[in-house]
Structures are given as C-alpha cells and as structure tokens.
Amino acid sequence: DPELSRGLGDVYKRQVAGAIEGRFLGLPSIAMSLASWECKHFDTAGNIAKLLVAQIDKSPLAYNTIINVNVPDIPMTEINGIKSTRLGNRHKSEPSIQDLNDPSLYWIGENGKEADNGEGTDFHAVTNNFVSVTPLQIDLTKYPEIKQVSDWLEKINY
C-alpha cells in the first residue's frame, strides 16, 4: 500500500487494520507500505514481501503479533538491510481544512511532524534506507492506567 504508515498513527491505517483482521482469522499478517507518496519502486517492496513471507513460512510469528513493514521507495540494490524497529511518534496533526466547495465539510489535517524519530524507530530506519519491521500487538489496553481510570470513574456520582 502506498500510504505511509510510520509512527503511532499506524494503529488506525488501513493496511494495519487489514493485517489485524487477517490475524483475527488466524492468518499470519503483514501490513506493508512503500514509504513514499510517489511510489516508484513497487518491485523493491515485492522482493521484501517475498523474503518476509518465506521467513514466516519457516518460522511463524506468535499468534497475537502482526508486523508493520515500511520499505524505502528506492531500488533494491540501495536497501541497507532490514531492521526490527519500534514506532516513532508524531506531533499532533495539522488543523482541519474547510472544504472550498462545501463549507459544512472539513478535511483532516496533514500528519504532524515527526516528534520521535531517533535510532531504533521506524522513521530512522526508513530515512537511512533500511526496511523497517515493527512488531505490533492487537491489545491496545494501557494496563498501567487501569487503576487511575478506575479511581477517576469513582468521582462520577452514578
């Protein structure tokens, strides 16, 4: 998919959603993106996909794991390798944009700028011509906050 899927916004991108659905069906799943808006090197992404599928066939991932893959949009010969990464982080999105033809409609603003793009992140890997492979889990529960939310809910007089 030519939609960029790097950073914490990944969890609601269509390719990640598709991979989650595949995992719910019991299938090993990969969310794959060519990290560019121009998308010139689909052959590179295809070659990387073949390598990853062959590896999954030999050594399957844990049931509750999907991998989010971002491939730099460059020739295969320029790829520096494949790295296991974590999701980077972005600043908040740009403000919404009012539709010029229908002022009652608004468009979601552009993605925020990279906030955490340091070594080990998907952003850093792709910027340095590495394929980024980020393991994702389906359970989004923020376990350390369960007690705090429980205490917060006690303040509701219901």
Regions found by a protein language model. Give the residues of each.
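Short glycine-/acidic-enriched loop or helix-start segments at secondary-structure transitions
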Residues: G9, H41, Y143
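Short, contiguous, pocket-lining structural segments
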Residues: R14, H41, A125
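Glycine-rich phosphate/pyrophosphate-binding loops
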Residues: A19-A45
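Charged helix-capping and loop-helix junction motifs
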Residues: Y12-A17, I48
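Single conserved hydrophobic/aromatic residue that forms the stacking wall/gate
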Residues: D1-L8, Y12
